[in-house]
Amino acid sequence: MKERQANFFRAPYSDPLRSIIAEVLNEFQNYETFFKLRNRKRKAVDQATLEATISAVICDLTHCYLTEPGGAVFVSLSNQSLGRRWRYRSKAENKKLSDILSILSSPELNFIVMEKGNKAELPDEQNQPIVKARRTTLRAAESLVRRIQNHNISLADLTFSDEEEIIILKDKKKDSWINGQLVSSAELLNYNDNPIADRYRAELREINSWLRSADIQTLPQYNHRDVRLQRFFNNSSFEIGGRLFGGFWQSGMKAADRHHSILIDNEPIVVLDYGQMGVRLAYSHVGATPPNGDLYSIPNPIAANRAGIKLLLSAAFFAEGPQTRFPQGSRKYFHPKIKYEDVIRAVLNHHPALRGVVYKGLGHRFMFMESQILVALLLELKRQGIVALPIHDAVIVSKKAKDAASLAMKNIFYRMTGLEAGINVE
């Protein structure tokens, strides 16, 4: 049985799903009345919390059932976790959640199946005791599944709540050993409200609202309502990273499937991307103009593989000190007898203006500039009435909007970098 983390930011989009939630709420309250679980009526704020919690649980388990029948979601029910103030937590993750789930999973209601988490002391490889915890899991039970089927609920009946935090700030990555493997990960930071985050949030809400109202069609296996974008910043800074993630076209669809799976304004789509974005931003950083042509095409036989040069340059922008070995995944593109230093020398001989840019850890700042350009572009396209789905340094638009969108991409790039942009069409 597959399990994923619960996402209690899901919300109903359609009246049929709202009807199911209303039925569940009604039966929940009838259960409380019958078993005399309450002595008085809830306060308005507590009633609102109850309704939001039931809605979130039913929506997420509906999504789980539709995408992975028989699958489950896991959730923490510890008071320490649920009682902590946390900007990334849903209102459904409150101290009453455990009690609400217990009633929803009761034999009388049978809306969900709940398997409570537990801790067990198990031996490790050296036969030393370690404590392993199994989280509480939830899945749709018979009463909920029946309603999903009777109402013909599909992914299109689901959306996301506006209460979800869309500006995400992560700490610096730290290494840790998990199951015998070295894993590098970054924790979410519970940052204080500030004008910069507020501005980014307002911009992204405007974009998300525009996408929610857009005429987007997909094949049935994709949820065309899933257009919510989040912006992720790195290294504890709102000036590092900033890429946009989310949306069915990024998280649930292969790149090769986009052209035959999406219609925008009832039109086929094209993908427009900024060519050699990272290198152009590096040139902009030093105030220089790049040479004409493909910036990854190096006129030297030892550096003739474009894919390898692209990986090598990207790694050099992110590296915080001189490198002596080929970056991961790039060695295969070069002859076994060719050394890294010979290739990077050939690259920098062709791009002498970038000698002061490599090995300075500037890659995240270039990524931030890329994200700023994309956000500005999406807002400009919205102003022109053009629906665009972002993919890091590219946008998906309808074929009829190709020329206008390409012009907007060039204008935004020039305005923000002082350089001409190369636009590729797929």
Which residues are covered by each model-predicted region?
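Intrinsically disordered, low-structural-confidence terminal and linker regions
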Residues: M1-Y13
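Short amphipathic alpha-helical interface segments
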Residues: L25-S90
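Helical catalytic core of nucleic-acid polymerases
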Residues: A44-A48, G71-N94, F245, W249-G361, ...
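Short amphipathic alpha-helical interaction segments
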Residues: Y88-E108, M114
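Acidic, glycine-rich two-metal-ion catalytic cores of nucleic acid-processing enzymes
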Residues: L122, Q126-G308, H392-A394
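Active-site palm subdomain of RNA-directed nucleic acid polymerases
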Residues: Q372-I391
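Short beta-strand-to-loop capping motifs
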Residues: V397-K400
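Polymerase palm active-site segment centered on the conserved acidic dipeptide of motif C
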Residues: K402-E426
